Amino acid sequence: LEKNDVTTLATLLGPDSEDVVSSGDEVADANARADFVASFKTRHTLVPEGSSSMTLVVGDDDWPLPIPIVAEDGKWYLDGAAGADELVYRRIGHNELGAIAVCRGFIDAQLEYASAGHDGNEPGVFAAKLRSDPGMQNGLYWPTAEGEPESPAGEAVARATAEGYKAVTGKRKPYHGYFYRFLFAQGAN
């Protein structure tokens, strides 16, 4: 885990562990593994769950690893298949909370953007995109020089960059498990 070696991790967890090892969001996965390692180093203990199963509990919050450690024929191993569903459920829940935070941040950024006029528009106009065109302020984010007021999405973009996300070049990648886009009208349903 410390080396972020996905291949070895998949081997350790057994066949059909792709959903356990990878969510499809490489940055979030690497950060989650690093958080787990840090929690493990802080504190870890094995909690017996009967005579043939244990749960690894880590960190100050006593986070239980959803993948049980089981005994079979006198050997102990991580049962990736048994823990896969629970890990995916936890990942989905975590990503949904992140998506809610992103949507709230989006609303805050749009309200901030609309509170002032940009590129000749009067106040009250919302941004139609996240990233502004070069030299423009027609999106929620534009680069600013030192001493200039930050763009409405500047703090969120800085936070995402600090987490390890990079500007999209080519194939889109999820942000905390989700893809986001601007909608300009209500759909048929």
Question: Where do the model's predicted regions map?
Answer:
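Loop/turn elements at helix/coil->beta-strand transitions in domains of secreted/extracellular proteins
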Residues: 5, 74, 176-178
